[in-house]
């Protein structure tokens, strides 16, 4: 059992090391992208301050709370992007047919297709985000229990993100339109930058219960400040595990229906 | 080792009508029968070649045997496993090499991919070193394994693909068009390699190809497949015996011969005096040779078989 | 001139063959629109006057912003950089057709198609959510058209300039990414630029950013609040200044790029 875990870890480390070697070959791009991401982070942060300089509360959220929400969003978004970078490269693998050569290898394809492109450089960016997040949280009066609940729900949000990325892989086996699917996911996720309450009722409901962006980001922060009902906490866990199960099923169905490229 | 009984594979090809709503919600699809009740068995240490035109079902067969595709119906057993389940114990014993497809990581060196495969296939250090040495020696490729793969020529890259795929000494090797797109020298090198590899490692090798050269040089057993059906499964030499009805008789005439005398043999397909070539039916051969010996003054008489290519071509034509 | 009309029609045809992709693209643009719209709606619902904007004014701003967003900011010139890299650009250069004009008409087709769709989308959205439709002050329409044309050409030359990076580097996405981020925040598509504090706003007026998108949209949605605060002549002068700079820079780098580039690849 442990031997298996050790071996899988070793493979994962090698894949990550390779990924690092490849990205360091395009240093210029790396610098620009990182700069761009930092810029975007700072500019949007500035907007929050701009809005709250003229008003104390937005849709029931105070400045500090909105900041923590924004930082939580950044953390979850960046973390899942860092881990699952390889999913964005899935389509060329399917189209070229090189996917077949991965499927024939004696290890779980997810090691390569899901986690095989971990961007260590981006991971470094995650640290300042994390630092800022914790800084702002500890300035507030939060009970230990709320903080724990917050952490658990953030992990829960990451599970939803994982389910989504696995779902993309499953989809990618069935159709070549997945680039669009990934991009729509990113766009939808962006809606979570601000409290889900700012959207009018119907939209807000959709994005909480059907496409669980609200569950991923707004709920953990609400729990942190003690505003999350027990009902919603249960729902959060239910939906994440349901989506995870669904996505793995989709992958398995995809494998059976997979017709491979060319011949 | 490999047992296939009544294997059927149907592909669903989606038809794009061009009308947006139809394309999303009411997709029409066409069913293509890629494999039609295919059956065969392959044992240890065999080298089998699958040949057939494009779309015959060769690659589909290989992909089902290696577990990539899910069979629509029928029985498939490789090394006692159902390939689609992709059990680790199964995958560790096989290898798939596809011409024009790459498992090597293009931005890194071949050695980097080799090391990754070492972990994936759990090859111990000693075995890894030994196999790597043997394989690179056969190709004389010691230097290029440390060069970035994207800088290598197509032939060199293919050699690296071979090494990467064989480091773990698989018992069964699937080769799908391994020499396609390569220059003559690389093709030769790959063929020699496959021959040497089988001799050395005693693996079962299944090869698909368009090039009859590959087949003639390597395979002892030939499976001809077209439109999802097996047309022939046997040795290369036996195919001529079974299917060829034609022999070619070439004459170099000693002196001028009257046309009527020659035309009694038949209408020549080549008539460039002093050379004359006739296409005759096998069963007529004794009579014709006797006639030539009696009536035609010749310097040289050669009797040749029909080319294997022609035999196979006519096999496909007749199938229609 | 007819050949450019053909370019126009061809680009439209291309869209019709990539229908699904195109509609998904519009869906994505629309989803992106929801964030700033609802954010600012919520803010102005709570604060009756946010830096000069009330609910009605913000609705008006974002109505026209979504309507005009792709028309002004959208472009197909992003393809140029990869065409340079692959050598595909040679196909165009060897034809008797002006490179600049070709891409201008290609963009025009692209923009007009998206204009129709964005109007349709925003109209539908406002209908469904019973949001009152804004009106425009016709008095300022000439000003609007002036800044619209300025913005169109400014965007065109600026985008070309960024694409010409492909002549000197293989990493073509990097500068475009940064540019894209700067534009999405500072152009006025995420928030109306004049909600910024007065000093910051005056500073920004010296940069090319407000002229790219904010000013035309402002002129058609709620020009009254801006007119008294600024000197029309000086901002028009500033805008034209940037246009001239980008025009000459793109011509210059085009010539230089053609000379230096060795067209490797295929």
Please report, for each region that a protein language model flagged, where it lies by residue.
Chain B
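Catalytic Walker B motif of ABC-type/P-loop ATPase nucleotide-binding domains
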Residues: 173-177
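Short, charged/small-residue-rich alpha-helical element at the C-terminal edge
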Residues: 248-315, 320
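Conserved ABC ATPase "signature" region
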Residues: 20-23, 115, 119, 126-144
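Conserved ABC transporter NBD signature motif
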Residues: 74-85, 89-91
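ABC transporter nucleotide-binding domain
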Residues: 191-279
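Conserved ABC ATPase signature
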Residues: 107, 148-155
């Amino acid at each position: 059992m442990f031997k298996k875990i050790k071996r899988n870890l070793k493979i994962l480390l090698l894949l990550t090391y390779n990924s690092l070697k490849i990205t360091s070959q395009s240093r210029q791009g790396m610098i620009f992208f990182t700069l761009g991401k930092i810029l975007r982070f700072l500019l949007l942060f500035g907007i929050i301050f701009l809005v709250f300089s003229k008003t104390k509360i937005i849709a029931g959220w105070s400045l500090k709370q909105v900041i923590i929400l924004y930082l939580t969003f950044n953390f979850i978004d960046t973390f899942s992007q860092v881990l699952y970078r390889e999913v964005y490269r899935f389509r060329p693998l399917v189209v070229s047919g090189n996917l077949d050569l991965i499927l024939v290898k004696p290890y779980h394809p997810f090691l390569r297709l899901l986690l095989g492109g971990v961007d260590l450089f981006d991971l470094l960016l995650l640290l300042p985000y994390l630092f800022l997040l914790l800084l702002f949280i500890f300035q507030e009066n939060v009970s230990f229990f709320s903080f724990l609940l917050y952490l658990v729900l953030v992990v829960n949000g990451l599970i939803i993100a994982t389910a989504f990325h696995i779902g993309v892989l499953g989809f990618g086996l069935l159709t070549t339109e997945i680039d669009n699917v990934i991009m729509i996911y990113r766009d939808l996720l962006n809606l979570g930058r601000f409290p889900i309450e700012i959207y009018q009722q119907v939209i807000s409901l959709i994005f909480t219960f059907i496409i669980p962006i609200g569950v991923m980001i707004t709920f953990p922060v609400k729990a942190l400040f003690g505003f999350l009902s027990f009902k919603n906490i249960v729902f959060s866990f239910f939906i994440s595990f349901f989506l995870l199960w669904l996505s793995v099923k989709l992958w398995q169905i995809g494998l059976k229906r997979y017709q491979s490229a060319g011949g | 080792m490999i047992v296939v009984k009544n294997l059927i594979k149907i592909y669903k090809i989606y038809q794009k009508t061009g009308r947006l709503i139809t394309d999303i919600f009411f997709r029409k699809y066409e069913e293509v029968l890629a494999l039609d009740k295919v059956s065969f068995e392959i044992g240890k240490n065999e080298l089998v070649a699958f040949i057939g035109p494009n779309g015959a079902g060769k690659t589909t067969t290989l992909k089902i045997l290696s577990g990539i595709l899910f069979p629509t119906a029928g029985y498939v057993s490789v090394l006692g496993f159902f390939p689609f389940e992709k059990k680790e114990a199964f995958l560790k014993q096989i290898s798939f090499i596809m011409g024009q497809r790459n498992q090597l990581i293009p931005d890194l060196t071949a050695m980097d991919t080799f090391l990754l495969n070492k972990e994936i296939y759990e090859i111990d250090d000693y075995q890894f070193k030994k196999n790597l040495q043997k394989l690179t020696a056969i190709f004389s490729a010691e230097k290029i394994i440390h060069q970035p793969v994207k800088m290598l020529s197509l032939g060199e890259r293919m050699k690296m693909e071979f090494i990467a795929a064989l480091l773990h000494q698989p018992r069964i090797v699937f080769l799908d068009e391994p020499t396609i797109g390569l220059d003559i020298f690389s093709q030769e090198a790959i063929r020699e390699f496959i021959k040497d590899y089988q001799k050395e490692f005693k693996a079962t090798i299944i090869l698909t190809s368009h090039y009859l050269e590959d087949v003639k040089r390597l395979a002892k057993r030939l499976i001809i497949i077209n439109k999802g059906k097996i047309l022939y499964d046997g040795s290369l030499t036996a195919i001529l015996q079974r299917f060829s009805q034609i022999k070619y008789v070439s004459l170099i005439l000693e002196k001028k011969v009257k046309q009527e005398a020659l035309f009694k043999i038949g209408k020549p397909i080549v008539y460039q005096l002093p050379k004359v070539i006739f296409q005759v039916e096998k069963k007529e051969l004794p009579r014709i040779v006797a006639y030539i010996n009696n009536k035609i003054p010749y310097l040289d008489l050669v009797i040749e078989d029909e080319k294997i290519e022609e035999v196979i071509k006519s096999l496909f034509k007749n199938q229609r | 001139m007819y050949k450019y009309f053909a370019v126009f029609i061809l680009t439209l045809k291309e869209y019709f063959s990539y229908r699904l992709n195109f509609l998904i693209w519009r869906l994505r643009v629309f989803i992106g629109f929801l964030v700033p719209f609802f954010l600012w709606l919520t803010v102005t619902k709570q604060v009756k006057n946010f830096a000069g904007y009330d609910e009605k004014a913000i609705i008006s701003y974002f109505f026209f912003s979504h309507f005009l967003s792709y028309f002004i900011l959208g472009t197909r010139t992003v393809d140029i950089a990869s065409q340079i890299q692959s050598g595909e650009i040679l196909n165009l250069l060897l034809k008797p057709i002006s490179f600049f004009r070709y891409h201008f008409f290609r963009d025009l087709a692209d923009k007009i198609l998206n204009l129709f769709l964005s109007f349709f989308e925003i109209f539908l959205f406002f209908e469904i959510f019973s949001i009152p439709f804004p009106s425009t002050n016709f008095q300022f329409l000439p000003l609007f058209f002036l800044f619209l044309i300025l913005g169109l050409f400014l965007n065109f030359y600026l985008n070309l300039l960024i694409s010409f990076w492909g002549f000197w580097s293989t990493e073509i996405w990097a500068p475009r990414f940064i540019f894209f981020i700067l534009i999405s925040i500072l152009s006025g598509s995420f928030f109306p630029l004049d909600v910024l504090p007065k000093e910051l706003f005056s500073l920004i007026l010296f940069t090319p950013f407000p002229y790219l998108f904010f000013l035309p949209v402002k002129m058609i949605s709620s020009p009254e609040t801006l007119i008294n605060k600024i000197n029309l002549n000086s901002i028009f002068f500033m805008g034209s200044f940037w246009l001239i700079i980008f025009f000459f820079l793109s011509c210059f780098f085009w010539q230089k790029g053609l000379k230096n580039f060795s067209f490797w690849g295929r």
